[in-house]
Amino acid sequence: MNGALSVTPLCQGTIDALIIACTELEKLTPHFPLMLDLNPRGTHLVVLGAGLTEDGKIRPVLEERLEASLRAAQRYPESPIVVTGGVPRNGVTEAQAMKDWLVARGIPPERITEESQSTSTVENARFTNDVLLERRATGAVLVTNRDHLERAMINFRQAVDARIPVAGIVAA
């Protein structure tokens, strides 16, 4: 079962040192973030890229993230999805490959927005924030691996500047 970081109000502030300290103290739970239950249409699932193989195929670490996002997407069918990651390999961006993977498993393509310009987690956060603003998101739930989640949460919380809450789901 995947876990989710709890959403502590202090972690959603505008002071970087407080965001970092608070995020480091958060704990994993066996539950999906509550904001998905309270407002599934406004809460976006954000799947973070993890690089592709040289021939443009999905690596195992990225497939773990996609499997976790698929479970969340099936449980919360009204939640929009953002797949984020550039770095093309063999003419395919991470975002394109992730969208294709999800669509092949039954997720409607119109439910998925691609952010395919980013080349780092900081850029994932910055460029995805633009998408979340445009779509008037009320929350974001990141989907990534355990060893990446804390850094990603910090980057996204800094990018959204306390406008919306950010939580996370751990893949496999």
Task: Go through the PLM ranges and name each one.
Residues 5-11, 18, 24-172:
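A structural signal for short, hydrophobic/glycine-enriched beta-strand patches
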Residues 1-2:
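N-terminal targeting leaders that direct proteins to extracytoplasmic destinations
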